Design a protein with these regions (language model features):
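Short beta-strand segments
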Residues: 18, 71-75, 119, 143-149, ...
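A charged helix-plus-loop insertion that forms the helical arch/lid used to bind
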Residues: 84-99
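Adenylate-forming
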Residues: 125-131, 152-154, 173
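ATP-binding/phosphotransfer module of carbohydrate and carboxylate kinases, centering on a glycine-rich
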Residues: 1-69, 78-87, 104-114, 128-140, ...
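Active-site nucleophile and cofactor-binding loops and adjacent substrate-binding regions
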Residues: 93-97, 117-123, 143-146, 279-286
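Short beta-strand scaffold segments in enzyme catalytic cores
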Residues: 24-28, 150-155
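Mobile, glycine-enriched helix-loop/loop "lid" segments at the mouths of ligand-binding/catalytic clefts
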Residues: 163, 167-179
């Protein structure tokens, strides 16, 4: 099958990639955003991982069709400003082997003329939840993912916030509990929220993954304290209409009520916010890939 992108006498499709630190999700969608097929596979080294994504699109595009646009939501930090020379590159990431990786070239080499739009994975997830998820009909909200790392996307007045780079919410410093002697998982900052409350931090601190820790484990008291502190900071600085907490760690159903209660205690109900102010995603694990499709549209 030819990989050259042409539109004459061909049906056109959109491509989407959610590139996380541990797994990659790829999808092919109609121009209206309906997903036709998708797959997931582990994040390995850049060359083999990106080539596997290229092969997915080459193998699964319908016959006599073309891929005209690709949206990529990637772990970061990443170059997301098209005006800068580092657009589409992974920057100072702790993910071994990925610093300097170019996310654009493997796809433009395989599909000449392909339009590619790149943003962070959390910004893509924020877009997805805004379309038909937990932030539908809202114009200002924050999406936080708590997985291997921690990141956040901020939407204010229906616009994703970007500046010099993109928000690095995972590297906000928080107060470390006196009882917590853990030195932190982040190689850059000892007491940032990613260093103290990410999935990697849970594993390093307790020797088990989050999904293997029972609800009564002391990890959750500490985890909810740190995440409630983060929500308090975001509320004070951004005043969003809602905070959405996603990612693998938040799939533990007992965690959200703990965070909500600790947030109320810490804030002393100062903001008088609705009960659904802090919630989990409505799109579940599909938030990011749906947002990546939106990037391609």
């Amino acid at each position: 099958m030819s990989s050259k992108v042409t539109t004459q006498n061909k049906n056109t499709y959109l491509g989407a990639i959610e590139a996380g630190g541990t797994k990659i999700i790829c999808a092919i969608a109609t121009p209206q955003g309906e997903i036709l097929t998708q797959t997931r596979f582990p994040t390995c080294d850049p060359e083999s991982t990106l080539q596997e994504a290229v092969h997915f699109f080459q193998k699964n595009l319908p016959l006599d069709s073309s891929l005209t646009s690709l949206g990529i939501g990637t772990f970061g930090p990443a170059g997301v400003n098209p005006a800068l020379p580092n657009y589409g590159e992974i920057l100072a990431t702790p993910k071994q082997g990925w610093q300097g990786a170019n996310l654009i070239k493997p796809f433009t080499n395989a599909f000449p003329g392909l339009k590619i739009t790149i943003d962070t994975d959390v910004n893509a997830a924020a877009l997805g939840e805004g379309i038909n998820g937990a932030a539908k009909d809202l114009d200002s909200y924050v999406y936080i993912t708590i997985g291997t790392g921690i990141g956040g996307g901020v939407v204010i007045n229906n616009q994703i916030i970007k500046g010099h780079l993109h928000p690095e919410i995972g590297h906000i410093s928080i107060h470390q509990e006196k009882s917590d002697t853990y030195t932190g998982a982040c190689p850059f900052h000892a007491n940032c929220i990613e260093g103290l409350a990410s999935g990697e931090a849970i594993f390093q601190r307790w020797g088990q993954k989050a999904e293997n820790l029972p609800p009564e484990h002391p990890a959750w008291e500490l985890q909810s304290t740190y995440l409630a502190s983060l929500c308090q900071t975001l509320t004070a600085v951004l005043s969003p209409q809602r905070i959405i907490l996603g990612g693998g760690v938040m799939q533990q159903s007992h965690l959200l009520p703990l965070i909500q209660q600790k947030f109320l205690t810490k804030s002393a109900n100062y903001w008088q916010l609705p009960p659904d102010y802090i919630i989990t995603p409505k799109l579940g694990t599909q938030s990011g890939i749906i947002g990546a499709i939106q990037l391609a549209m």
